[in-house]
């Protein structure tokens, strides 16, 4: 089997920028790898995810139902697009994965049920659906003040373009708490991406990511 390394983080943390940097670095090193990203909006398997984020199921959709929407998208992607590469031993670098359910949907669950939700998620995605467990996960920890500013810039100041999750700052604060909770339980690497209202340089974060990836390349 190959190695599956997952980069996750809240919206506006700089995942896309860092993936560009990592792609260039790994290519220059001659590393044979496959890059994947979730949700896979270009595929029909993401249809329910799109409806959920557009608010078509309301703002109180069951976190178990929402988790299933994302999980099915990942299952389809694995079976159709990267299972062969993974089983052939290739390095897979994922932007988001099962880990996002352990952030966004955990945050939508009562805090006293967090351990039970994570137990359910592990059994559902890895055992029942048969998705590969990540070999390593890093969480890009960008201060919310910075990520909100970056998202506003991304949408040219049009707040209406933000999805169900992106526009709820209080929810995103809980998402960060959930991410750090999952990180502690599952041994994720947390990479700070800024301090206060200032982001760290792109290069500094890339160096931290490459150090994290070193055992797999």
Each predicted region: which residue ranges?
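P-loop (Walker A) phosphate-binding loop of NTP-binding proteins
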Residues: 10
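Hydrophobic positions on the alpha1 helix immediately C-terminal to the Walker A/P-loop
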Residues: 18
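NTP-dependent small-molecule kinase module
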Residues: 23, 145-217
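ATP-dependent small-molecule kinase phosphotransfer cores
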Residues: 29-129
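A glycine- and Lys/Arg-enriched "phosphate-lid" helix/loop adjacent to the NTP-binding pocket
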Residues: 99-177
């Amino acid at each position: 089997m190959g190695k599956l390394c997952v980069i996750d983080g809240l919206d506006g943390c700089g995942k896309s920028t860092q993936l560009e940097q990592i792609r260039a670095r790994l290519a220059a090193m001659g590393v044979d790898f496959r890059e994947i990203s979730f949700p896979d909006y270009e595929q029909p398997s993401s249809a329910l995810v799109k409806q959920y984020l557009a608010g078509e199921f309301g703002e109180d959709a069951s976190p178990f139902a929402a988790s299933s929407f994302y999980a099915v998208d990942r299952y389809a992607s694995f079976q159709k697009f990267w299972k062969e590469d993974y089983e052939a031993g290739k390095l897979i670098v994922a932007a988001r994965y099962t880990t996002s359910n352990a952030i966004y949907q955990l945050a939508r669950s009562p805090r006293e049920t967090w351990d039970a939700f994570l137990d359910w998620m592990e059994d559902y995605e890895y055992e029942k659906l048969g998705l590969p467990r990540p070999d390593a996960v890093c969480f890009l920890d960008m201060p919310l003040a910075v990520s909100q500013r970056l998202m506003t810039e991304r949408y040219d100041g049009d707040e209406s373009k933000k999805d169900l999750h992106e526009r709820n700052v209080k929810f995103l604060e809980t998402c960060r708490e959930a991410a750090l909770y999952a990180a502690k339980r599952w041994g994720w690497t947390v990479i700070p991406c800024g301090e206060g209202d200032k982001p760290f340089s792109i290069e500094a974060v890339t160096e931290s990511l490459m150090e994290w990836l070193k055992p797999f390349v």
